[in-house]
């Protein structure tokens, strides 16, 4: 039986179970995770991405040199519009 080509998707969605045979050899059994495991994995990755976005955003705020209230307001509005546009398209 031929094994399907390993891709990043199949590698990340398959779990490898190693079982010992009676003679000491190890066999690998590829097992597809259930939907709950996939959703859990997806949510974990997305929350990490979201945390990274927030960190980058705060670093940009902290890098501003003595901003005026007007420049902050302009910056916030630009970021808000950009963020909303990305939310609607994704």
Swiss-Prot record:
It is found in: Host mitochondrion inner membrane; Host nucleus; Host cytoplasm, Host cytosol. The record marks 66 as: High pathogenicity. It comes from the Viruses. Residues 1-29 are annotated as: Disordered. Pfam families: PB1-F2. Residues 7-28 have a biased composition (Polar residues). The keyword Hydrolase does not apply. GO terms for cellular component: host cell cytosol; host cell mitochondrial inner membrane; host cell nucleus; membrane. Residues 65-87 are annotated as: Mitochondrial targeting sequence. Oligomer. Interacts with human SLC25A6/ANT3 and VDAC1. Interacts with host MAVS. Is not encoded in all strains, and seems to be dispensable for replication. Belongs to the influenza viruses PB1-F2 family. This is Protein PB1-F2. It comes from Influenza A virus (strain A/Turkey/Minnesota/833/1980 H4N2). The gene is PB1.
